[in-house]
């Protein structure tokens, strides 16, 4: 006799694993399916920035979502570390957003004014003051915003911790098990099918398939408007003296990491599912990093890699019920902030599944905002 699992989650990245963690912690029977290894795609490629100011232009629903998730990490980190036995390398390093051209100062002022209602600490620095914080910054830096609360975490460790803790609470993980179809009764999914021909009965289906979420459209008959966006990233050995803060400038960032490394990221490219590195992408990263911090010119290269972000048309996630389905929930399209949004997404989707009601914070992120009819 076929057993039935309470919730099947399609996608074993940081979002799927976070949802599994919050559900299983509440006693829900969960199974997570991934087309590859658990956490092997964008979640492990990510830099792990917990820096909410950058994606925001001011207050609003997206700011509420990001800042709420950001505020969960100080308590979530020790909880996850204890439940999983994995250290997350969570650090409140603070971030500097710098400009090198005096003509850009007014725009930086405007950004700071727009961010002030968000409630995060910010300090305006002159170029000299910025170099006091980071002596290796370019001599031509003329102004900066310092946000001391912005933080970072080791992304690959976070997804491992979510998955290990969820497994300890009873979640079953199926790697290399791509879900390729469903069985339905009226407007409910009753079973899911894998590429290997296996069948699993479930009471609820959650789609958290990252850049591959649009592939679910054909069997849900719901348009999920997500495309992959390639990000190229590299790491360098730290210069001397080492960098201590996250540095944002000229559409790139530098992030000091354990092991005496600095991560430089990241390109944003529409390249389909092509994950290869390009000479142009790596050259842009290196040139920008050296413009911001000239001492990096002599730093040995460490590694280079890519990841595929799941991007929606408005660069905000899709959270909530799938239209015309009673027991299908979407948690997709987190773009470049999946690590930062993992906490609130896991908590919110678990609450939705358990209580049957969409939490207020998720209302603005319904798929229905796009109103795209399904095309087979």
Where are these regions (language model features)?
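Conserved Rossmann-like nucleotide-cofactor binding loop
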Residues: 15, 38, 212
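Dinucleotide-binding Rossmann-like beta1-alpha1 core, especially the glycine-rich loop
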Residues: 48-129, 133, 288-290
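Short beta-strand to alpha-helix junction loop
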Residues: 64, 98-107, 146-164, 276-280, ...
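Helical element adjacent to the flavin cofactor pocket in flavoenzyme catalytic cores
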Residues: 145-196, 200-204
């Amino acid at each position: 006799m076929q057993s039935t699992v309470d919730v099947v989650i399609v996608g074993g990245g940081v979002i799927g694993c976070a949802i599994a963690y919050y559900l299983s912690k509440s006693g829900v029977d969960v199974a997570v399916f991934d087309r590859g290894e658990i956490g092997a795609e964008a979640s492990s490629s990510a830099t792990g920035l917990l820096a909410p100011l950058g994606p925001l232009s001011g207050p609003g629903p997206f700011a509420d979502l990001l800042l709420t998730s950001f505020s969960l990490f100080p308590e979530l980190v020790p909880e996850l570390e204890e439940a999983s036995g994995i250290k997350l390398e969570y650090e409140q390093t603070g971030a500097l957003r710098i400009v090198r051209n005096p003509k850009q100062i007014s725009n930086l002022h405007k950004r700071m004014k727009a961010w002030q209602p968000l409630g995060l600490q910010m300090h305006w620095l002159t170029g000299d003051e910025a170099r006091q914080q980071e002596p290796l910054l370019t001599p031509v830096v003329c102004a900066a915003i310092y946000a001391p609360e912005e933080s970072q975490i080791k992304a690959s460790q976070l997804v491992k911790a979510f998955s290990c803790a969820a497994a300890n609470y009873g979640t079953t993980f199926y790697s290399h098990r791509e879900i390729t179809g469903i069985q339905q009764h009226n407007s409910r999914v009753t079973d899911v099918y894998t590429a290997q021909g296996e069948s699993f009965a479930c009471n609820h289906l959650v789609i958290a398939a990252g850049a591959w979420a649009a592939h679910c459209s054909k069997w849900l008959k719901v348009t999920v408007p997500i495309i992959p966006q390639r990000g190229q990233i590299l790491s360098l050995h730290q210069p001397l003296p080492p960098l201590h803060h996250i540095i944002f400038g000229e559409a790139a960032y530098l992030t000091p990491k354990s092991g005496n490394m600095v991560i430089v990221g990241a390109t944003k490219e529409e390249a389909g599912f092509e994950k290869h590195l390009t000479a142009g992408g790596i050259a842009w990263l290196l040139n920008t990093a050296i413009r911001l911090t000239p001492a990096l010119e002599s730093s040995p290269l460490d590694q280079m890699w890519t990841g595929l972000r799941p991007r929606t048309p408005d660069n905000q996630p899709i959270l909530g019920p799938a239209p015309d389905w009673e027991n299908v929930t979407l948690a997709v399209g987190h773009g470049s902030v999946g690590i930062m949004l993992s906490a609130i997404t896991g908590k919110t989707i678990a609450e939705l599944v358990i209580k049957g009601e969409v939490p207020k914070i998720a209302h603005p992120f319904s798929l229905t905002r796009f109103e795209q009819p399904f095309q087979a």
